[in-house]
Amino acid sequence: MRYTVALTGGIGSGKSTVSDAFADLGITVIDADIIARQMVEPGQPTLNAIAEHFGSELIAADGTLRRRALRERIFSHPEEKAWLNALLHPLIQQETQRQFQQATSPYVLWVVPLLVENRLYQKANRVLVVDVTPETQLIRTMQRDDVTREHVEHILAAQATREARLAVADDVIDNNGAPDAIASDVARLHASYLKLASQFVSQEKP
């Protein structure tokens, strides 16, 4: 198994900004959210299964999934969320493993929004948390997704707390400021992870 840095953070924390910065340095990024989105693209069997289960009204005229409508449907129906997870999670895990096997960079950045909630941090060598204040999360998510404050507050209430994420963190990037401040933090961590990955490889060798 390649040395793995798990990246997590709450909604609106800026995980994509951070993961893009690592990708720019040549690091393989495996993003659970991106894999999940690919699973429900038009033509995928999973999208057909979702349409059959929830109804064709969740499919837009262009054949794509109406994600917001699906989110709203499962948010207030735990049993529907459980059904969707049972459908998607095995496929996401399978694709994640495939991408790990194909990775070529010295270490892999594994982006997992629900790392703490699903206790997946146990599968990583190191945990990097993108940290912002709850108020920053609210403002960014409202602007990005064009949703109400109440909607975002419901999402935040369902996610792990800021304290719970920080409790499992080995490294933290403070993303409350300007996005261009991220690059220097990522460069510093990248240098550290290269050393750790090298040590990991030498320990793995017989």
From Swiss-Prot:
Under InterPro entries, the record lists:
Depp_CoAkinase, P-loop_NTPase
Top EC group: transferase
Listed pathway(s): Cofactor biosynthesis; coenzyme A biosynthesis; CoA from (R)-pantothenate: step 5/5
Compartment(s) of residence: Cytoplasm
- CDD domains, from UniProt? DPCK (cd02022)
| Record-listed ATP binding positions | 12-17
Record domain DPCK: where: 4-200
Catalysed conversion reaction = 3'-dephospho-CoA + ATP = ADP + CoA + H(+)
Q: What is its main location?
A: cytoplasm
Per UniProt, the keywords (alphabetical) are: ATP-binding, Coenzyme A biosynthesis, Cytoplasm, Kinase, Nucleotide-binding, Transferase
Which GO biological process annotations does it have?
A: coenzyme A biosynthetic process
* The protein's Enzyme Commission number: 2.7.1.24
| GO MF term set | ATP binding; dephospho-CoA kinase activity
Q: Which GO terms describe its cellular component?
A: cytoplasm
**Which Pfam families does this UniProt record tie to the protein?**
CoaE
Which PROSITE patterns has this protein been placed in?
Answer: DPCK
Give the protein's function. Answer: Catalyzes the phosphorylation of the 3'-hydroxyl group of dephosphocoenzyme A to form coenzyme A.
Which PANTHER family does this one have? BIFUNCTIONAL COENZYME A SYNTHASE-RELATED, DEPHOSPHO-COA KINASE-RELATED
As for family, the record states: Belongs to the CoaE family.
Record's NCBIfam families? dephospho-CoA kinase
Name of the protein in its database record: Dephospho-CoA kinase
Natural source organism:
Salmonella choleraesuis (strain SC-B67)
- This protein's encoding gene: coaE
